[in-house]
Each structure stands twice: as structure tokens, then as C-alpha cells.
Amino acid sequence: KEENKIMEKGYLSLVLHAHLPYVRHPEYEDFLEEDWFYEAIVETYIPFINLFDKLALDGVDWRLTMSITPSLANMLIDPLLQERTVKHIERLIELAEKEVIRTQWQNEFNTVAKMYLDKFKNTRYVFVEKYGKNLINAFKKHQDTGKLEIITCAATHGYLPLMEVVPNAVKAQISIAVTSYTRLFGRKPRGI
């Protein structure tokens, strides 16, 4: 009977999508929209890299697909944004150090302040020392082991079906995305 039939195994694919609009303002010392970039590095990309590194260290057989948009990828290798990211992390460490002192007589708050101080110091270590401010290399390292599959998307993160009224625009979006990916990751993308 049908109910006794063994179900076939399949695959579930989780695809993480990493994107930020391109923001770079050398004309300003601080620019609010750039904070999104720094926060994404501290709160998302480095925690993922730490997880990938830990899985590799523990010998876990894992697979994940992640898209990194051309705008984000190019921001991640930009020297100005890399230096500003270091300054952002340094400010977080300074604030956390002050919080540890301020909360020294409040155990429950002090524990949290110390946790954040440790987290931000680890973030600085991973970003500056371990990966030389280049998170593309961190992601590429895991792609080169076959565990992480990095794909791209349209060059400006545009929705290609809506661009089909101008076929040359679609071709340009894909061509630029593939060129950017190849330059940064050393091979053509296997997906978009």
C-alpha cells in the first residue's frame, strides 16, 4: 500500500542573502547610512564567519549557500570603509569598557557589559588580525573548502524580471555581476 512506501529523501537548501546598498561618502568623516554597513559586519557577517570557522575546526560536515551582492562585496574590500569599520569597532570597545566600569556594582548588568566587551574584542581580532580587514577572503576560504557556496545577484540588486523591458540592461546587470564576482572570488559564480 501507499502508506507503507518509504518516502524518498530530498534536500533542503537555505540560501542566505547578504546585501546592502552601496554607501561610501569620503567627503564626510561620519555618515549615518554607513553605520548600516558597520553594524552588518559586527552583528551579522563576523558572527557567521566565526560560526563557519568553528564548524570547520570541529570537523562538522556542513553546506550553505549565501549570496553576496556586488555592491556589498565591493564595500567589503574598500580600504576607506575597512578603516572606518575598525574605528567603529574601536568605539564599541571603548563604550563597552565604560559600561563594565559603570556597572561594576550591578552584577546582572556587569555580566552583560563584559559579554559585549569580549564580543567586540573578538570582532576586532577577527576583522583586523585574522582576516586583515578583508571579509571577502574569509568567505572565500570557506567556499574554497566546498562548504560555503557563494552566489551573486544583479549588479545593482535590481529585480531582473522588471528590467526585461530593456534586455541590454539585464545583460549588463548580469555581466557586471559576474565580472565583479570573478575578480573578487577568483572564479565565475555557480549561481545568481
What residue spans do the PLM features occupy?
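Carbohydrate-active enzymes and regulators
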Residues: 2-192
